[in-house]
Amino acid sequence: MKIEVKDNNIEQALRVLKRKLQRDGFFKVVKLKSVYEKPSEKKKRILQENIKRVKKLNKLKNRI
């Protein structure tokens, strides 16, 4: 990932980097990998994420 620093404005470049990492899901992966997750908990989490995604898609379809 490449971020341009304009006018030596490091703070703005850091904000842009953080925003891009957030959109890519980097922080979520780091959080999940920082602690061991039991296989049963992993299956449960993935199932909940799938249900949430399906509900979100159905909600968007109903809007249109």
Swiss-Prot record:
Disulfide bonds: none annotated. It comes from the Bacteria. One of its GO terms (biological process) is translation. Keywords: Ribonucleoprotein, Ribosomal protein. Pfam families: Ribosomal_S21. GO terms for cellular component: ribonucleoprotein complex; ribosome. GO terms for molecular function: structural constituent of ribosome. InterPro entries: Ribosomal_bS21, Ribosomal_bS21_sf. The keyword rRNA-binding does not apply. Belongs to the bacterial ribosomal protein bS21 family. This is Small ribosomal subunit protein bS21. It comes from Pelagibacter ubique (strain HTCC1062). The lineage of its organism: Bacteria, Pseudomonadati, Pseudomonadota, Alphaproteobacteria, Candidatus Pelagibacterales.
